[in-house]
Regions:
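Active-site-proximal inter-transmembrane loops
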Residues: 43
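Rossmann-like adenosine-cofactor binding region
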Residues: 81
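Hydrophobic cores of alpha-helical transmembrane segments in multi-pass integral membrane proteins
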Residues: 10-36, 46-77, 85-125, 129-158
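Short, Lys/Arg-rich, polar N-terminal cytosolic tail immediately upstream
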Residues: 1-4
Length: 160
């Protein structure tokens, strides 16, 4: 068991850290040689936008929402402890999943839109982007499992 105040502090710290990482993910847009504003207009470039929003929703807003959920559990139901293993599994799965999905979708979108911008056919662009498909899907799956562990932890805390 772990004190719920510790869980709230950890989730809040991670949401601030993820906000900083989200700002860092925006820096490549400011480098003119990478041509991000042009590449986003090509069809694979939307993967870069999706990757960024997945990270924002899962890692920044998601961690803030979990901070709020655990805070409500503490204040409204006066629950003092939750399961330590479920909390750590939730944090690890959410963080790794968000980073994995974001990095590989961003990378695949950049490679694909660069190829499309240089005039390659859609078939070739699709083949070039295949490397990012499985890791991106794995990241999304880890995000879902992390949220499932959080929900399970809330339910188990209510029952005790």
């Amino acid at each position: 068991m772990i004190r719920i105040e510790t869980v709230i502090k950890n989730f809040l710290k991670l949401s601030v850290l993820n906000t900083i990482v989200a700002i860092i993910f925006l820096f490549p847009i400011l480098i003119p040689q990478l041509a991000f504003p042009i590449l986003i207009t090509e069809w694979p470039g939307i993967y870069m936008v999706l990757a960024y929003f997945i990270f924002l929703f899962a890692a920044v807003i998601g961690f803030i929402a979990w901070t709020f959920a655990y805070c409500l559990l503490w204040k409204l139901y006066e629950i003092k402890f939750v399961k330590r293993n479920l909390v750590y599994a939730q944090i690890v799965f959410l963080e790794i999943g968000a980073l994995l999905a974001c990095i590989f979708m961003y990378w695949g979108g950049y490679v694909g839109s660069s190829a499309a911008y240089s005039g390659m056919s859609e078939f070739v662009v699709g083949i070039m982007m295949e490397f990012a498909t499985i890791p991106s899907g794995l990241g999304i799956g880890l995000i879902l499992f992390g949220n499932l562990f959080g929900i399970l932890n809330l339910i188990l805390a209510w029952k005790e």
